[in-house]
Amino acid sequence: MKVLQEMTAVRLLQLKAIKFQPKNPFTWGNGWTSPMYCDDRKILSYPKMRDFIRLELARVIAEMYPDADIVAGVATNAIAHGVLVAEQLSLPFIYVHPQPKDHGLENQIEGDLRPRQSVVVVENQVNTGVNLAKVIEAIRNNGCKVLGVVTIFDYGFSATKRKLEKMDVSLTPLTNFETVLRHASAMGVIDEEQKETIENWQQNPAKWEK
């Protein structure tokens, strides 16, 4: 996995899918300020990178979860990657909202999921894990087993790690915060002062101030 983590980190940085702005931080949807941002949606615009992610996520699932019956994407950002991976593995696909919709059929799970199926969840990136936890719970409430979660990038927040461990769910990222930051520094994308700032943020993102 280490070689894969290194390769994925370098490719994401070359694609400029991960941006760093310690002095002009981004605002996340949950209100946190962050000196970095993973724009993994850019991957979909570049066929070679898109194929790389598709093949590697599929390979991880095939090796770690050979008994998977179905692939579930976390709505909405992981739907595209989930579909690509399911197609590669010739597996059925569903996607799951963090909450049931308030219109139409009011579904939380979109597609056909039968009780007792074994599910692998595809997430585009893992940060707080709040929505991911809701998706896992919804799948389990449908009488199914969550084999594990695969993702492109993991921020590695300690609170998220504890949350997934408590839920007894394994997480396998193609790359992670430490690997990306190390390569960003080596490639001259960030300097040492910026690297230290970003590391401090990652230790306590909810209370970080620039």
Regions found by a protein language model. Name each.
Residues 64, 111-115, 163:
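Solvent-exposed alpha-helices and their adjacent loops that cap or buttress functional pockets
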Residues 57-69, 136-142:
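Phosphate/pyrophosphate-binding loops at sites that engage ATP/ADP/AMP, CoA/4′-phosphopantetheine
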Residues 81-120, 128-134, 187:
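Short, glycine/charge-rich flexible loops or terminal/linker lids adjacent to PRPP-binding catalytic cores
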Residues 1-64:
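Active-site-facing substrate-recognition patch
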Residues 69, 117, 147:
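Conserved acidic residues
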Residues 66-75, 150:
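Short glycine-rich phosphate-binding loop at a beta-alpha junction
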Residues 2-15, 137-210:
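PRPP-dependent phosphoribosyltransferase catalytic core
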